[in-house]
């Protein structure tokens, strides 16, 4: 015999509250290492977000290294990007950005079916991009595999025949773009002299001196400060040498590291590009 409908109703609907687990609605505590040790197993560092970094430094009496005013601190603080040659991540400002553009044939018309990878000076969101190490010698040694430098999204949707990298002009094109930018900026930028505390001195010394050097000099009332010295004689570029050496009094050009950030960044990239690894 089956149970009457009233019995079903009593069992399913009118169940006494004393048999219900009151803690069933509570969330089970996360104990899985996939959650508790996410940063460890995923190889990702835990990120800390602050609305006001300066307020945090003052509130908790933390040491302030003033990296905002440090040339090299700004370079190292740039976003991390995966690099195509070493397959490692590095600061974006220490890499060569590459952009994907339509390939142009002999008739100077773009071929929609072919894509070309070219070096550029600055990252742009309007192009699909990737990055390689900012070193002429390393790039030269790996140009044979340059088609693998295309972004992954392009490699997955294109055939090898449709991808092009001009290895004969790749290095010279990037070098020419850097020099053209630097020449244009140096020809109009004022020489701030040794008055600026946060400064970079450009010199032209063809002797065996390092391309980049940090010196401790006296400023004002004899207070010691550090200044970066960029030796453009390392580039063997007559036009740049003439611009830097035109001031016989200062024997170089002083740049303000706060106001001339873009120029200093490209000067650093140029010296880094030509440095011997």
From Swiss-Prot:
One Pfam family in the UniProt entry: RRG8
Superkingdom of this protein's organism: Eukaryota
Any Gene Ontology biological process: mitochondrial genome maintenance
GO cellular component terms, semicolon-separated: mitochondrion
Subcellular location: Mitochondrion
Major location category of this protein: mitochondrion
Keywords: Mitochondrion
InterPro entries cross-referenced by the UniProt entry: Rrg8
Similarity remark: Belongs to the RRG8 family.
Entry function: Required for respiratory activity and maintenance and expression of the mitochondrial genome.
Protein name: Required for respiratory growth protein 8, mitochondrial
């Amino acid at each position: 015999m089956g149970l009457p409908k009233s019995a079903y109703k009593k069992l399913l609907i009118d169940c006494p509250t004393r048999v219900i687990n009151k803690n069933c609605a509570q969330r089970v505590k996360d104990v899985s290492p996939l959650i508790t040790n996410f940063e460890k197993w995923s190889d990702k560092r835990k990120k800390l977000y602050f609305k006001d970094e300066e307020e945090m430094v003052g509130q908790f009496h933390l040491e302030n290294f003033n990296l905002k005013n440090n040339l090299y601190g700004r370079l190292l603080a740039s976003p991390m990007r995966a690099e195509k040659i070493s397959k490692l991540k590095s600061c974006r400002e220490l890499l060569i950005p590459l952009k994907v553009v339509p390939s142009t044939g002999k008739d100077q018309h773009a071929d929609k079916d072919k894509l070309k990878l070219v070096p550029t000076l600055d990252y742009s969101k309007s192009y699909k991009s990737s990055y390689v190490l900012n070193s002429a010698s390393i790039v030269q040694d790996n140009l044979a595999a340059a088609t693998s430098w295309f972004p992954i999204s392009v490699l997955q949707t294109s055939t090898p025949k449709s991808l092009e990298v001009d290895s004969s002009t790749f290095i010279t094109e990037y070098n020419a773009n850097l020099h053209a930018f630097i020449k244009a900026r140096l020809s109009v930028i004022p020489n701030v002299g040794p008055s600026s505390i946060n400064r970079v001195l450009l010199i032209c010394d063809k002797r065996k001196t390092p391309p980049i050097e940090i010196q401790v000099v006296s400023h004002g009332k004899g207070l010691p400060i550090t200044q970066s010295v960029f030796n453009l004689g390392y580039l063997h570029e007559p036009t740049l040498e003439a611009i830097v050496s035109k001031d016989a009094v200062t024997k170089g050009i002083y740049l303000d590291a706060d106001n001339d950030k873009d120029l200093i960044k490209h000067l650093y990239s140029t010296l880094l590009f030509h440095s011997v690894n």
